[in-house]
Design a protein with these regions (language model features):
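Generic alpha-helical structural context detector
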Residues: 37, 65-68, 97
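The canonical Cys-X-X-Cys-His
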Residues: 34-42, 95
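C-terminal capping alpha-helices of c-type cytochrome domains
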Residues: 75, 84-103
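Gly/Gly-Pro-rich "capping" loops immediately C-terminal to redox-active cysteine motifs
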Residues: 27-29, 44-71, 81, 85
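Electrostatic cytochrome c docking/interface patches
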Residues: 13-33, 51, 69
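Detector for the c-type heme attachment site
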Residues: 40-45, 100-101
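N-terminal export/targeting leaders of redox proteins
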Residues: 1-23, 103
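Glutamine-centric residue-chemistry signal
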Residues: 22, 58, 66, 91-94, ...
Length: 103
């Protein structure tokens, strides 16, 4: 019975660290996406009257396809090609997921 109590205590002690890691990951992804606010608005909600598309709530796969096309240079753009090249594919996936989750 004692090993079970020890295991329970260890799991309880580790829970705050798991939560902290999730918080840090969320902050990291939000900071990646913050670059987009300059043109696409805070959290991807475009400013009314802007010619820039809103990113908030767009399907993740659609966003990711566009971001990868910008990075590859197959989708013409004035600045997005340069910006997208600065991110890894994993970061682009995180950014697409972030904006897709914004409602």
């Amino acid at each position: 019975m004692k090993p079970l109590a020890t295991l329970a205590a260890l799991l309880a002690a580790a829970a705050p660290f798991a939560s902290q890691a999730q918080d840090q990951q969320a902050l990291y992804v939000r900071s990646l996406a913050a670059t987009c606010a300059n043109c696409h608005g805070t959290d991807g909600r475009a400013v009314v009257g802007s010619t820039m598309p809103a990113l908030a709530g767009m399907p993740r796969d659609q966003l990711l396809t566009q971001l990868k096309a910008f990075k590859a240079g197959t989708r013409p753009s004035t600045i997005m090609n340069q910006l997208a090249k600065g991110y890894t594919d994993a970061q682009l996936e995180q950014i697409a997921g972030y904006f897709a989750a914004q409602k």
